[in-house]
């Protein structure tokens, strides 16, 4: 039985990383340090820009986050690829929330644009995922557009984020 709520705490997300939230066959989020959100504040099967599902999640920013110490020394900034990965993580999480089973794998993205950055002085990153399509056949796949905001200001956009759930990844 899927634990299907509208919001999830950090402990819930950590449970997902241990395979405890969506069951033994459900997709898992990564563990820290690669878990790129602290909470999911909204999940719906409708809504979003296409009325086919919406996820909103947040990451609290503080200067002690691991990536600020190495990217870059003297010029700390959150790597843009981590924001992109967070959006893929949320697409996979949504597929598990819908009851999908398998191991989540990012399959691609149409276009990514960066128009800002996350500095250690920021307070909060918000991720917004707008689902366009869910394929539920032999392969379960989510297709969505995403946005990353820092302290309420839009800084990244991604179109056609794709994540699939695989029963067997040995030949992937």
Curated annotation (Swiss-Prot):
<protein>
    <recommendedName>
        <fullName>3-hydroxydecanoyl-[acyl-carrier-protein] dehydratase</fullName>
        <ecNumber>4.2.1.59</ecNumber>
        <ecNumber>5.3.3.14</ecNumber>
    </recommendedName>
</protein>
<dbReference type="GO" id="GO:0019171">
    <property type="term" value="F:(3R)-hydroxyacyl-[acyl-carrier-protein] dehydratase activity"/>
</dbReference>
<dbReference type="GO" id="GO:0034017">
    <property type="term" value="F:trans-2-decenoyl-acyl-carrier-protein isomerase activity"/>
</dbReference>
<keyword id="KW-0413">Isomerase</keyword>
<feature type="active site">
    <location>
        <position position="71"/>
    </location>
</feature>
<keyword id="KW-0443">Lipid metabolism</keyword>
<keyword id="KW-0963">Cytoplasm</keyword>
<dbReference type="InterPro" id="IPR029069">
    <property type="entry name" value="HotDog_dom_sf"/>
</dbReference>
<comment type="subunit">
    <text>Homodimer.</text>
</comment>
<dbReference type="InterPro" id="IPR013114">
    <property type="entry name" value="FabA_FabZ"/>
</dbReference>
<keyword id="KW-0444">Lipid biosynthesis</keyword>
<keyword id="KW-0275">Fatty acid biosynthesis</keyword>
<dbReference type="Pfam" id="PF07977">
    <property type="entry name" value="FabA"/>
</dbReference>
<comment type="similarity">
    <text>Belongs to the thioester dehydratase family. FabA subfamily.</text>
</comment>
<keyword id="KW-0456">Lyase</keyword>
<dbReference type="InterPro" id="IPR010083">
    <property type="entry name" value="FabA"/>
</dbReference>
<keyword id="KW-0276">Fatty acid metabolism</keyword>
<comment type="function">
    <text>Necessary for the introduction of cis unsaturation into fatty acids. Catalyzes the dehydration of (3R)-3-hydroxydecanoyl-ACP to E-(2)-decenoyl-ACP and then its isomerization to Z-(3)-decenoyl-ACP. Can catalyze the dehydratase reaction for beta-hydroxyacyl-ACPs with saturated chain lengths up to 16:0, being most active on intermediate chain length.</text>
</comment>
<dbReference type="GO" id="GO:0005737">
    <property type="term" value="C:cytoplasm"/>
</dbReference>
<dbReference type="GO" id="GO:0006636">
    <property type="term" value="P:unsaturated fatty acid biosynthetic process"/>
</dbReference>
<comment type="pathway">
    <text>Lipid metabolism; fatty acid biosynthesis.</text>
</comment>
């Amino acid at each position: 039985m899927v634990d299907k709520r509208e919001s999830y705490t950090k402990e819930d997300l950590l449970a997902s990383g241990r395979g405890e939230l969506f069951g033994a066959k459900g997709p898992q989020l990564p563990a820290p340090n690669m878990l790129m959100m602290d909470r999911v504040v909204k999940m719906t099967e409708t809504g979003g820009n296409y009325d086919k599902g919406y996820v909103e999640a947040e990451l609290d920013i503080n200067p002690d986050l691991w990536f600020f110490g190495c990217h870059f020394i003297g010029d700390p900034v959150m790597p843009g690829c981590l924001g992109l990965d967070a959006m893929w993580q949320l697409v996979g999480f949504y597929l598990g929330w819908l009851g999908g089973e398998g191991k989540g794998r990012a399959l691609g993205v149409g276009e990514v644009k960066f128009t800002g950055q996350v500095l250690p002085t920021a307070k909060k990153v918000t991720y917004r995922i707008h689902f366009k399509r869910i394929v539920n056949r032999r392969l379960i796949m989510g297709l969505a557009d995403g946005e990353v905001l820092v302290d309420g200001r839009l800084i990244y956009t991604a179109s056609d984020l794709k994540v699939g759930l695989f029963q067997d990844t040995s030949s992937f």
